């Protein structure tokens, strides 16, 4: 039985069929909770034993919803990605208001927590060391490119995907601080739910790099926005490098 196989596995006994079973179980969970025309999988998917589930069963944009969809395209479940795409599209209009009112920036973004009503701002009266996460929007937008990258659906990229990616890249550029040494860094920035507010958090720079690369590639595919592409390439080339600690570790 599976319960015994789990016990054996925990003791170090190899079981490649058990690993395959869990792989397929993960696919099943996403298939069951994320189908076209419905909402994307939330913190609990569609399973919890309370009327009001933990964290209000919302969408945590600081890794949880992204993690739900990491295996979607790579395990041949492209259609299961569509609810996330539709959800991201609903964040653009309210997300534009957030970027304008909070940062005086172009484009759109989201924050740590989201819901079915288009909530994109930081939570009220909460600690900003974990609540402040303006790169949640660009991180979500990278999934738009991922969907195109797997499907090669040029119509999707042209009619839906590119505008979302471009707008997110525009926000990213506006948010960055051009330092006196000529490099760009994110300030203020945090590592999600870990540590104080500072500048140049590795997580933030990683998201910045990814969304700018996505925007550059998307504009090349469609043959549009050469002027903006040059700006994205310039910022990408001058983004402050990752920092390495005295033990050789990538600093957070």
Locate predicted features.
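Acidic/polar, glycine-enriched structural segments that form the non-catalytic walls/loops
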Residues: 1-59, 78-99, 223
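Alpha-helical scaffold segments in carbohydrate-active enzymes
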Residues: 21-32, 87-90, 94, 163-175, ...
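Extended ligand-binding clefts on enzyme/binding-domain cores
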Residues: 18, 57-82, 91-100, 194-252
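Alpha-helical scaffolds flanking conserved acidic
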Residues: 16-20, 158-163
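Alpha-helix C-terminal capping/termination sites
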Residues: 12, 19, 31-32, 68, ...
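The feature captures the catalytic groove of carbohydrate-active enzymes
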Residues: 42-59, 106-159, 167-234
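Active-site lining segments of carbohydrate-active enzymes
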Residues: 6-13, 76-139, 148-149, 227-252
């Amino acid at each position: 039985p599976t319960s015994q196989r789990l016990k054996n596995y925990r003791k170090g006994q190899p079981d490649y069929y058990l690993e395959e079973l869990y792989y397929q179980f993960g696919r099943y969970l996403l298939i069951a909770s994320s189908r076209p025309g419905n909402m994307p999988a939330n913190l609990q998917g569609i399973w919890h034993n309370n009327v009001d589930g933990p964290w209000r069963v919302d969408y945590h944009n600081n890794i949880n919803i992204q993690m739900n969809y990491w295996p979607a395209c790579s395990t041949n479940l492209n259609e299961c990605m569509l609810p996330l795409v539709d959800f991201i599209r609903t964040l653009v209009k309210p997300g534009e208001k957030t970027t304008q009112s909070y940062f005086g920036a172009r484009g759109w973004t989201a924050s740590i927590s989201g819901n079915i009503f288009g909530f994109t701002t930081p939570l009220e009266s909460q600690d900003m060391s974990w609540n402040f996460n303006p790169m949640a929007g660009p991180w979500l937008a990278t999934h738009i490119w991922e969907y195109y990258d797997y499907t090669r659906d040029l119509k999707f990229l042209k009619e839906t995907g590119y505008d979302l990616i471009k707008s997110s890249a525009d926000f990213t550029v506006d948010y960055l601080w051009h330092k006196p040494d000529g490099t760009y860094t994110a300030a203020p920035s945090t590592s999600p739910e870990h540590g104080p507010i500072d500048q140049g958090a590795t997580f933030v720079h990683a998201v910045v790099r990814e969304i700018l690369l996505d925007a550059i590639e998307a504009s090349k595919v469609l043959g549009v926005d050469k002027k903006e592409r040059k700006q994205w390439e310039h910022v990408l080339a001058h983004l402050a490098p990752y920092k390495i600690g005295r033990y050789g570790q990538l600093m957070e």
